[in-house]
């Protein structure tokens, strides 16, 4: 009885142990199954995101083709517009014959207000570098002001002033501004100004600064053209005004003028007729005397018969 009683608890323990092992195994299988269930939606979501990204990439690739086409079309349109603009643009005359100046860019088509031409902008233009000999912008008996060739803005260019000496190298002055003021000395001086743009010479002009005595002599020896010009202009204006008044008088009194000229022409015609008649009478009276003896001879011959 004791052996059976001892065997029963051992069997119960074995059965309990097996049950616990089975429960642990079942729990482990549930965990693995639940993990697989969680992983499957994640994999599905990853697949969906990959498919969405692929569709977006395809859409982008499809959208890139028309963008390139549109850019090519836009470039072609810009080229055509540029060509038409070149054909429709004219350039005005440059404001200078040498050095650097400005000119107008004129549009001949597409102007606002239906105008045939309009100024689009103003741009820089350049002529020959050598401008020869210039004149001071202002001078008096004591000094003279010289100016280099430039346009606005003045500080855009670099200016190099030189003192010219015969048979010697020119002396570069320290002044680097566009205007140079010189005091007259006992001998005439010659200066040169070079205008540089990015170390490239765009203009060069020379000046002569005379002495005070030379300046006075030049002013005194200069013909008084101003007075002559004023006199000629005054006489011309007076003559023009007189002619205008005469024309106005003739237009207003055209009938009287016409009758006056008609009577005058008739009087001249009468005088011409009288003179022609007098000429005829004088020619008839001035016949040759040989005509009369001929008639007398005829009469005598008839009487003798």
From Swiss-Prot:
Q: Which residues lie on this side of the membrane: Extracellular?
A: 29-231
Q: How does it sit in the membrane?
A: Single-pass type I membrane protein
**Topological region Cytoplasmic:** 253-305
What subcellular compartments does it reside in?
A: Cytoplasmic vesicle, Secretory vesicle, Acrosome inner membrane
Q: Which residues carry this modification: Phosphotyrosine?
A: 279
Reported consequences of knocking out the gene: Males are sterile, while female fertility is not affected. Spermatozoa have significantly impaired swimming ability. The sperm head has a rounded shape instead of the normal hook-shaped morphology. The acrosome membrane does not associate normally with the nuclear envelope or intermediate filament bundles, and fails to expand along the nuclear surface. The sperm nucleus remains globular and mitochondria appear disorganized.
Annotated region Disordered: the residues are 29-81, 281-305
Known tissue expression: Testis specific (at protein level).
List, alphabetically, the GO terms of the cellular component aspect.
acrosomal membrane; acrosomal vesicle; inner acrosomal membrane
Which CDD domains does the entry link to? Answer: SPACA1 (cd13783)
Mainly localized where? Answer: membrane
Q: What is this protein called?
A: Sperm acrosome membrane-associated protein 1
Per the UniProt record, the lineage of the source organism begins with:
Eukaryota, Metazoa, Chordata, Craniata, Vertebrata
